[in-house]
A protein has these predicted regions:
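Sec-dependent N-terminal signal peptides
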Residues: 6-19
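Short, Lys/Arg-enriched N-terminal segments with co-localized hydrophobic residues
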Residues: 1-3
Length: 196
């Protein structure tokens, strides 16, 4: 019985020291090399000169490969979206699973257009890229925080999406995060890959 108690105590101590810190603050996001600012955008607040701001930070240590079967890849990672308005600021933690088809990277599309028609116009390449980005995402909101790192308890349901990414303005933040995950995993940007 005494040996069992010692075992339980040892397990509790191990669990305490191996648990990841769950809370995240704006200071951590800005100061730790583990978090990379991969997207930032300011836009006017209610038509005035005061700006709202969205900043996305990728936890570079969280990126893991789930599938590697070129030209198809699947990665999973965690990122934090910081929303700043004139009145408040908040942090939202997301888990992003991105499935990549490099047949649709800009490099591959340009290569394919040149094979079909040697002087492919950039318009045709851009049109093809807009029709299909080559990235499908599953986005799961995990937690919400105040900028000091305290968790926000809310009755608002956590967001969940499963959909293809658009290369346009609507998804430019998620595209930047998915591209940064690809660069962390493979040391190359998604659109630089050329499938021959």
């Amino acid at each position: 019985e005494n040996m069992f108690r010692k075992f339980l105590l040892a397990c509790m101590v191990m669990a305490t020291f191996t648990m990841q810190i769950q809370a995240i603050s704006i200071n951590e996001l800005n100061s730790s090399s583990q978090f990379k600012n991969v997207y930032q955008k300011s836009y006017p607040y209610e038509g005035g000169s005061i700006q709202n701001k969205l900043i996305s930070y990728l936890n570079t240590y969280s990126v893991e490969s789930l599938e590697y079967a070129a030209p198809h890849y699947k990665l999973k990672g965690t990122f934090y979206a910081v929303y700043e308005t004139p009145r408040s600021a908040s942090i939202t933690e997301y888990e992003l699973t991105a499935t990549y088809d490099t047949n649709y990277s800009l490099g591959s599309l340009i290569q394919a257009m040149n094979l079909v028609k040697p002087s492919a116009s950039m318009y045709a390449v851009i049109k093809a890229a807009q029709d299909k980005s080559g990235i499908q995402v599953e986005l799961q909101e995990v937690k919400r925080y105040n900028v000091d790192g305290t968790e926000v308890i809310s009755k608002v349901p956590l967001e969940h999406q499963l959909r293809p990414l658009d290369r346009g303005r609507f998804d430019e933040d998620l595209f930047a995060v998915a591209d940064a995950m690809f660069a962390v995993a493979y040391q190359q940007h998604f659109d630089d890959i050329v499938v021959k």
